[in-house]
Amino acid sequence: MASGILVNVKEEVTCPICLELLTQPLSLDCGHSFCQACLTANHKTSMPDEGERSCPVCRISYQHKNIQPNRHVANIVEKLREVKLSPEEGQKVDHCARHGEKLLLFCQEDRKVICWLCERSQEHRGHHTFLTEEVAQEYQVKLQAALQMLRQKQQEAEELEADIREEKASWKTQIQYDKTNILADFEQLRHILDWVESNELQNLEKEEKDVLKRLMRSEIEMVQQTQSVRELISDLEHRLQGSVMELLQGVDGVIKRMKNVTLKKPETFPKNRRRVFRAADLKVMLEVLRELRDVRRYWVDVTVAPNNISYAVISEDMRQVSSPEPQIIFEAQGTISQTFVNFNYCTGILGSQSITSGKHYWEVDVSKKSAWILGVCAGFQPDAMYNIEQNENYQPKYGYWVIGLEEGVKCNAFQDGSIHTPSAPFIVPLSVNICPDRVGVFLDYEACTVSFFNITNHGFLIYKFSHCSFSQPVFPYLNPRKCTVPMTLCSPSS
């Protein structure tokens, strides 16, 4: 009931032009009221006689000067705007909030659902309108496509979110890895500094003891020499102060003694020839450590691959290689044509990794071994290996880039033999201050180099093969030789 009254009141205070509640209502002589903006717009479009215009509703003429603001209607409109619809009215979402009419039309320009009164209002005048049923399917397709696109965008957004989280985790891992490396590097630097300091101080103490001992011995000799000259002077003074007989008695011996007096100069130790530790020596060590750290970035986990040629003893984890008890290895039926073969070749073993490109690094523990050979091999060559004439024929031209130790102290590299002795390798003696207990091997396939590092001596370079001819896949190579102590492939985490 109340809703019906409100609707009737709204109709009375609705502008006949825009069909909306009156805004700043103006009343004409005929009693009709219009919005100020609507009436002004109507004046511009109409062609009245001079000074007179007609009402848009009843066409009765009126004078412009007679137009009056209708404050009473304005107050009613203000009150109506404050009135809320009942719950039943509010639930009618398919009805126009302004006019209460059912929403049956769709304005294409404004893309809004409107009622028939809205369609006739100034706001939608001249717009293209359609029944909601006519455009619903079209917009359903559009919204479905938009939904599909948004779902795809959502998936992409989730993937981007996952990527950034993964990158964040990766960065945290990388930073933690770098922190660990820095701590390890500086710990190693401190260890090197402590070792260098201790070693230099020990050398100085040894030098001091040796030099002072020799100087003391020289001092004793100089004291004895001075005493001998002093005694000869005393004898001469006594003769010169005595009688003629005392002067001439034994004078020949005295003269001979005088002639034989030759002063022996003391042994000296020039200070400018001493080798004193300099900061430059430490710089060399730091440079070596930096190079070792760089190549260790390419550390690969190497294990050995058993084969039917090698007689080496291999551990279950495929990391340790040792030699059987030294003995003559007799022919294994169907494999070797000689009645016995070179023992060193029979204990050689290849790593399981076939290398055809890139940079690779690994370390081998050879502590307590008196003999070993290690490096890189291009694969076994039985025809060359089992020729008894070829004794330890480890030459690059046969696919071996190796170094070795024998008799516990002699470290050698094996190069190609000369034109005069092509069947025997050219052995290059290597100078190492500290015999390596652990050797690092770095292979750069593209640069054609194989480098060996003395890990025991802070990573100093032992030897480097350059201009290597890698015409086929190469493998890590280990040979324990006749020493039964095992050699061990170290894991990257060791």
Curated annotation (Swiss-Prot):
This is Tripartite motif-containing protein 5. It comes from Symphalangus syndactylus. Its EC number is 2.3.2.27. Belongs to the TRIM/RBCC family. It catalyses: S-ubiquitinyl-[E2 ubiquitin-conjugating enzyme]-L-cysteine + [acceptor protein]-L-lysine = [E2 ubiquitin-conjugating enzyme]-L-cysteine + N(6)-ubiquitinyl-[acceptor protein]-L-lysine. The gene is TRIM5. The B box-type zinc finger domain and the coiled-coil domain contribute to the higher and low order multimerization respectively which is essential for restriction activity. The coiled coil domain is important for higher order multimerization by promoting the initial dimerization. Residues 186-199 are annotated as: Required for interaction with GABARAP and for autophagy. A zinc finger (RING-type) spans 15-59.
